[in-house]
């Protein structure tokens, strides 16, 4: 299968070795200090190190939160947000892995930009600040 790029409202890049582009993309977005949200399996597989290397090649600082568990709860998101706050400022969040790291990364973004708890955002149009 050949690689491709798809640009709806969210940019999706697919293809062999595209993980190595993460640093250049983060720099293009203006990041200087990135939070990488992932799980122990992704770390063990070596993907986290590849992303960190790509970010470091662009002289970007990386903070790693690799404690995501399968089917994360609101408490997991709260812990990730607390980690992010204790290491602020952060100007980019990357969710690396499957659905669980992605969900925790998105939830962390909600809490960092809008405050409160995850339960505050059940429903529609609850987040009032841009993320």
Residue ranges of each PLM-predicted region?
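Glycine/threonine-rich beta-strand-loop-alpha-helix active-site module
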Residues: 75-131
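ATP/NTP phosphate-donor binding region
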Residues: 1-92
């Amino acid at each position: 299968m050949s690689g491709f790029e798809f640009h709806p409202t969210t940019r999706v890049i697919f293809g062999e070795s595209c993980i190595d582009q993460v640093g250049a993309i983060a720099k293009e977005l203006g990041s200087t200090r990135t939070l990488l949200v992932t799980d122990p399996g992704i770390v063990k597989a070596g993907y986290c190190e590849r992303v960190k290397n790509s970010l470091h090649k662009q002289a970007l600082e990386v903070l790693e939160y690799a404690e995501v568990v399968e089917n994360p709860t609101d408490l997991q998101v709260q812990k990730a947000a607390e980690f992010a706050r204790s290491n602020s400022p952060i100007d980019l969040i990357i969710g690396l892995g499957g659905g669980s790291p992605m969900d925790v990364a998105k939830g962390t973004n909600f809490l960092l930009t809008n405050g409160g708890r995850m339960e505050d955002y059940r429903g529609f149009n609850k987040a009032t600040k841009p993320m």
